[in-house]
Amino acid sequence: MKTENSLAKNLSAADNKAALDASCKRLLANKIILAWILKECTEEYKNCSVDDIAEKYIEGTPQIAQTSVHRNEKSGENIDGLNTEDSSITEGTVTYDIRFGAVVPNTDDKIHLIINIEAQNDFYPGYPLIKRGIYYCSRMISSQYETYFTESHYENIRKVYSIWICTRPPESKKNTIMQYSI
């Protein structure tokens, strides 16, 4: 009798529904798939094995579209865990598809990254996706205040990545990776 692992179960469940949001997020949140994404899309992991990335460098369990603590409130919930919802009284709420932390390999100091993976069905949603990606990165940076840094200790800000996977790109954009950095 064959036993399916969690990746195989998620692939089976998604079968003809892979474009459905929840199924797609569950598939992308698998640590092995995340490890492949990190290996191919980030400089920090390009020389690492996929197994090492999944087992040694991805921290904890990647969070999938879960609610969080309101970032403007002080409470015992304001900890090192990564939530997928970023709320601000003045800026509204952003819900990240998948969000997790990772450690940079082969560094003297333990350097942490905050990584967001977005599954995007519509390649042309009526606004520039790049601007939305920049906005998400900006929110991930600003939300670190009072969690990873306070006052003027900007040296403690963690590097962020927002990686967007377009599930239905136009023919000319299929099998491509576009990178933007600021």
Model regions: which residues?
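Accessory alpha/beta interaction modules
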Residues: M1-I182
